[in-house]
Design a protein with these regions (language model features):
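Extreme N-terminal starter segment of soluble prokaryotic enzymes
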Residues: 1-3
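Active-site glycine-rich loop that binds ribose-phosphate moieties when present
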Residues: 207-227
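A short, Lys/Arg-enriched amphipathic alpha-helix followed by its capping loop at the start of a domain
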Residues: 15-28
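Electropositive, gly/pro-rich neighborhoods at or near active sites that engage anionic ligands
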Residues: 21-24, 34-150, 181-211
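A short helix->loop->beta-strand "cap" motif at the edges of active sites that frequently abuts
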Residues: 27-28, 260-264, 309
Length: 352
């Protein structure tokens, strides 16, 4: 059996622990296609938060308290940067984590594509699944917010290290909005998703998400091939708006999923009307989707009607969920330990 998982970072990484354990039970192969929309360049280094969260979690090196970064992390470099007044102070890189970014950036600068760099990094961590970035190309999630003077300050935009490329975002192709060609119009501006999420805690007046580079991005080698050869495609219980949608925005990925032979089963990230973790409710509000299992299921839609899903696994609290032309099943979805997560994965695979 071949299993493909479309996934984001922290929640998706925990889900993949269960997928890996299930795969070992049944002798399956697993490929994880990971979101890169959160990626940014910081202090000259390429940082891939979701890829690293998955790699560290599956490799046994993730911090269980924070849910991100490395266990036993230290912050000497962060403190030294702060002493120099280097921005951004709101996004810290731990000393151990920095080693990953240094190796990644060195390899990228030497000409290696991201999927090969990821494979090389994974040789240390032995995640037990194949990790693929959704694309090797530039793809960043930017957020269109109401303009505020503090957002335009050098500190907020990280000086020369900022990843907000307003000239690119200002094009109609990048924003799918002709008004954006003139500085977004109506007092709007773009900031990187990480600034919106980490610094501002998703509290700014927000208009939409833009996946910069998606139209030109190509799937990383192996992505569409894995989907075409899969026996089942699972959509992890990751943030639908900013973890799963950027993957599907890469040209050719959505088509590979919707036209491929494998059944597509999604797992709801919403239990009883609330996110399992994080601020997915705020992201869903930006895209006009109700924070519920039904809302997310309808966002993905039925494959038979041009959407993604053949099956939708929801929590027992949401057993009455109905998605037209999609098989809906309820099961315990709290990933309290590996056994619970394996049972959840098994329930999803059995829907295929």
């Amino acid at each position: 059996m071949r299993i493909v998982v479309l996934t984001g970072g922290i929640g998706g990484a925990r889900f993949l622990l269960g997928v890996r354990a299930y795969a070992q039970e049944v002798g399956a192969e697993v490929t994880a296609v990971v979101n890169v929309g959160d990626d940014l360049r910081l202090h000259g280094l390429r940082v891939c938060p979701d890829l690293d969260s998955v790699m560290y979690t599956l490799g046994g090196g993730a911090d269980p308290e924070r849910g991100w970064g490395r266990t036993g992390e230290t912050w000497t470099v962060k403190d030294e940067l702060a002493a120099y007044g280097a921005e951004p102070g709101w996004f810290g890189l731990g000393d151990k984590d920095l080693a990953t970014h240094l190796v990644r950036t060195t390899m990228l600068d030497a000409g290696y594509p991201l999927h090969q760099v990821t494979e090389a990094l994974a040789t240390r961590w032995q995640p037990g699944v194949r990790l693929l970035p959704a694309t090797n190309d530039r793809l960043e999630t930017h957020v269109i917010v109401s303009a505020r003077s503090e957002l335009a300050s050098p500190a907020a935009t990280n000086n020369a290290s900022t990843v907000s490329a307003r000239s690119e975002l200002a094009s109609p192709a990048a924003t799918n909005n002709a008004a954006a060609a003139d500085g977004f119009g109506g007092g709007q501006q773009a900031i990187h998703f990480q600034e919106w999420w980490v610094r501002h805690r998703a509290q700014l007046p927000t208009h939409r998400f833009v996946f910069v580079g998606a139209e030109a991005a190509k799937p990383a080698p192996g992505v569409t091939e894995a989907i075409a050869e899969a026996d089942v495609v699972l959509i992890a219980p990751s943030n639908p708006a900013v973890s799963i949608t950027p993957i599907l925005a890469v040209a050719g990925v959505r088509e590979a999923v919707t036209t491929g032979p494998a059944p597509v089963v999604g797992v709801s990230p919403i239990i009883g009307g609330a996110p399992v973790r994080g601020m997915a409710d705020r992201c869903l509000a930006v895209v006009g989707v109700e924070c519920s299992a039904a809302g997310v299921g309808q966002l993905y839609g039925a494959r038979a009607a041009g959407g993604l899903l053949d099956g939708w696994l929801v929590a027992e609290e949401d057993a009455q969920t109905v998605i037209p032309q999609v098989t809906v099943r309820a099961a315990p979805l709290r990933m309290t330990d590996e056994a619970a997560t394996v049972a959840m994965v098994r329930a999803a695979v059995e829907m295929a």
